[in-house]
């Protein structure tokens, strides 16, 4: 009897859990469409900015590319600042752990981390001494104004001369089932290795000159790049959560079916035993 009650209780818990995972799956599915719309529309915009900066870099002397910002002090460090984009919520499969694995492969003791997303503290806790914003980790936001404020703070840190370069660690969206943890170089801007389509910029004039524009427009470039990475990571996160919840729902269904079989087996066994006892009792009376 005790085993029967235990199985019934487990089956009830599985059914409740299944309702939760199914609801979360549907919520994630509804968020994916909006997240994709934001990401792909911004992707077209950022690609234009990227092409313009690639063109600017191709027309700018290499010596300037190394000194494209006015630093507060001479930059002689080899330290790299990694901006790590995680999620605020869990239950999204290997989304956060994959980012953590990627950063652990590359980070050195002299490097620093700037976290965006509360879950970063959980998965990168062993690097506490290297996290620059340990007590002020920002929640992930798909609002450009919020990302712009973060980018301004990071640019200020870069201009202090404490870092040789800045890299962004985010999740690249490939398709609905594939997301790749990626480390992208952000600053200083390097001369593009890809072939510039001169025809696209043949009628483009720079006023006053490429170097001045390059210098003034770096904040726009960096905030746009960071925003693009945040949006792409967000699409990957909600897609990963939908799949995780879909798998959890399937597992709940399978476990529920298994428990039902066990429950029915015990019930049948109990009924058979009772019938046997009744028959045996009747035969004894006869």
Curated annotation (Swiss-Prot):
Subcellular location per the Swiss-Prot or TrEMBL entry: Cell membrane
Keywords noted in UniProt: ATP synthesis, Cell membrane, CF(1), Hydrogen ion transport, Ion transport, Membrane, Transport
Keyword Membrane on entry: yes
One function term, GO molecular function aspect: proton-transporting ATP synthase activity, rotational mechanism
UniProt entry tagged with the keyword Chaperone: no
GO biological process per UniProt: proton motive force-driven plasma membrane ATP synthesis
Family matches, as InterPro entries: ATP_synth_F1_ATPase_gsu, ATP_synth_F1_gsu
Lineage top rank: taxon: Bacteria
Membrane topology: Peripheral membrane protein
One GO location term (cellular component): proton-transporting ATP synthase complex
Quaternary structure and interacting proteins, as annotated: F-type ATPases have 2 components, CF(1) - the catalytic core - and CF(0) - the membrane proton channel. CF(1) has five subunits: alpha(3), beta(3), gamma(1), delta(1), epsilon(1). CF(0) has three main subunits: a, b and c.
Similarity-based family: Belongs to the ATPase gamma chain family.
Stored PANTHER family: ATP SYNTHASE GAMMA CHAIN, ATP SYNTHASE SUBUNIT GAMMA, MITOCHONDRIAL
Role, per record: Produces ATP from ADP in the presence of a proton gradient across the membrane. The gamma chain is believed to be important in regulating ATPase activity and the flow of protons through the CF(0) complex.
Designated name of the protein: ATP synthase gamma chain
Species this chain originates from: Mycoplasma mobile (strain ATCC 43663 / 163K / NCTC 11711)
This protein's encoding gene: atpG
